Amino acid sequence: VLISYLLCFFIALLLHELGHLVAARLCYVPAPEFGLGWGRKLFGFHLGGVEYKFHALPIGAYVRLDIAELQRRSLSRQVLILLAGIIVNVVAAALTAGTPFGMMNLLLAATNILPLYQQDGWKCGMVMLRALLRRKSAVVEWTFTIAGSCVSLALIVFQAIRHL
């Protein structure tokens, strides 16, 4: 049972990152690297201008975007690329509702939308803040980061207490 849940999570994670990759390519933002796992690289290959890497620890995944090119895109395209993984997970969860795979997709979408540092929700919030302010502001960005972490923690604690 544990193996099947881990497999569901891994596939949901793969779909999430593929969402970012496909959205970036559709918006002409280079994504030179797609990685599964962390730690030492076990193997990899190049395909279509992307280096696909597989690492020793099968925890997490990432798509490395060309940030300079991403920032040259419109606000709506930046937000689309940053939220594409979450959108894919929500669609997959809806299509497979009531299954472990649906649950893993929903869990992945819910945790990624939180404004926690380096999560998709945080990155999207930063893009929108910078567009709203028309500049970078360290004070505002740190305030958003700290407040986002506090709100996320409060939501998690509230949910945990609610389910006791």
Where are these regions (language model features)?
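Hydrophobic transmembrane alpha-helices and their immediate loop junctions
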Residues: 1-164
